[in-house]
Amino acid sequence: ERLFAEGGFFTPDTRARFVATTLARLASPVSPEWPCVLNPGRIRDQWHTMTRTGLSCRLSTHIQEPYVEIHPDDASRLGLEQGTLARIETPHGTASVRVLLSRGQQPGSVFAPFHWSAQNSSAGRISALVHGITDPISGQPESKATPARVVPVRVSHYGFLLSRSPLRPQRLAYWAESRAMFGTSSGTTLHLALDLDAAGIAAWRHATLPAG
């Protein structure tokens, strides 16, 4: 049975009601400790947590990693550079993502897509950072305005691996996996970052990559 198929609502006379409310301040405003507003949202080619769209190589090619979009002035003040890693912190958790500079982003606000999970990223779960405050009437969460801060993540090396089978290398400071096409067959692209010295990189490469 389809909900509201007959046009009625859960009111005494089955008619819809408009509820007038007074515009309220944010339940958790920004502060010196949490100076940014985290605005989670969607990107063009993915749906929710990518349980279906994430299986498509074509849809995964457009944007392959979780990221935080930030105004260049904010990035300069925070010591963030395009393409490097940043950690988004809120009172509820942290996420490590790529930095994307955009003058279209409002200063003081950062955007981050919520599609990535522990299945395809090391620490890209943006939804885990959002507070659980909801509107008392509609139940709608105040998910577009969680106070946050963004700090640089220092690593020694960036790279990526292409593989026809899923990879889970050890000792990575960051990783994000996406589907990819290799000729007529599919596989995965693993974007990664390490924080190791030269000897550590050599040992990691020997343990991770096939000989030859």
Stretches with model-predicted labels:
Residues 1-58:
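Long, low-complexity segments enriched in small/aliphatic residues
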Residues 49, 53-69, 73-212:
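Long, contiguous, secondary-structure-rich segments that constitute the structural scaffold
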